[in-house]
Amino acid sequence: MRVLAAMSGGVDSAVAAARAVEAGHDVVGVHLALSRMPGTLRTGSRGCCTIEDSRDAWRACDVLGIPYYVWDFSERFKEDVVQDFIDEYAAGRTPNPCMRCNERIKFAALLEKAIALGFDAVCTGHYAKVIEDADGNRELHRAADWAKDQSYVLGVLTHEQLKHSMFPLADTPSKAEVRAEAERRGLSVANKPDSHDICFISDGDTRGWLAEKIDMTTGDIVDETGAKVGEHPGANAFTVGQRRGLKLGTPAADGKPRFVLEIRPKENKVVVGPEALLAIDEIRGIKVSWAGLPISEVATGAEFDCHAQVRAHGDPVPAIARVEAVTDESGVERAQLVVTLTDPLRGVAPGQTVVLYQGSRVLGQATIDAARSLQRQVL
């Protein structure tokens, strides 16, 4: 097969490309330029997508003896990932930019261009697994190394995208083995630290970065009863579950710390309360999609057992889910995912993503529109 290897400049994508070459595929490496000012992106142990990473990707391709190209996706990244991040925070939601990048850049724009150029598949260094059944249908599953598993951030992939996706690290038992293999292959990135945080926020100060992009206006911090307990410099920079950065003039009666329970951007208010009120057991999601073909219960609206995960490395919890049709404010009917959790989760914020699993299989995902406690009816 003709395979396009997405080279991030890290050890995982380098070893994934090496395995694709070793498997006999015709492999071409490509690095995505996601900014026309890469010096503003994070570097070293906490970054990705920088000039340094581009050079590391080139060196890896040189060792592997495969062609290397750089594709400029900076405008699309700015529009589909960076601007989306700003818009979501402005609306009082908490987005996941890495998931959005996978959805709109790596497995949309990149895959579309690859197929147009005659490639059969895109190969990445993600820790996830694609399984094909007897009918040729593709399913997305967790990787062998659950500690490094990245199936959560790939839950947005469609069946058609999975048909053209390769994850050579799927059965690798540990990251240590990947690094050891890179060392044996003479890849200079063998001991390169993993990237973390948000690549387009150079100093990691999300609140400060957002303050330059969003009109921040001081407003009230209120408790769960509506009483004013402090002021904030701008509601949009907060997220549900946050404790740090709250300047409360009125302490809680019990003396215990308070956490952000809700963001109300239209009122420019931040609602705070005790940690216990962060526990939610019902999630309602929009923008529902299925990884592979949806299970039969989706079409009938029947409930089905699953596990729900709301963070990339969070613990999945038992849940019961169903899909129902709802009519939005504009009169358009759309699908809504309703997930009832057996074990409550804390700090679930609108804008985050809930991904559903059955065993190791990823069923699908939705963007969280609302989260509440069925017992307290707080949020």
Swiss-Prot record:
Q: What class of enzyme is it?
A: transferase
Q: What Enzyme Commission number does this protein have?
A: 2.8.1.13
**Marked site (Interaction with tRNA) residue numbers:** 126, 352
The active-site annotation reads: 101, 199
Among Pfam families, the record links this protein to: tRNA_Me_trans, tRNA_Me_trans_C, tRNA_Me_trans_M
Disulphide-bridged cysteine pairs: 101-199
Its Gene Ontology molecular function terms? ATP binding; tRNA binding; tRNA-uridine 2-sulfurtransferase activity
Q: What does the record list as GO biological process?
A: tRNA wobble position uridine thiolation
Source species, domain of life: Bacteria
Q: Which NCBIfam families match?
A: PRK00143.1 (NF001138), trmU (TIGR00420)
Q: Per its database record, what is this protein's job?
A: Catalyzes the 2-thiolation of uridine at the wobble position (U34) of tRNA, leading to the formation of s(2)U34.
UniProt-recorded name of the protein: tRNA-specific 2-thiouridylase MnmA
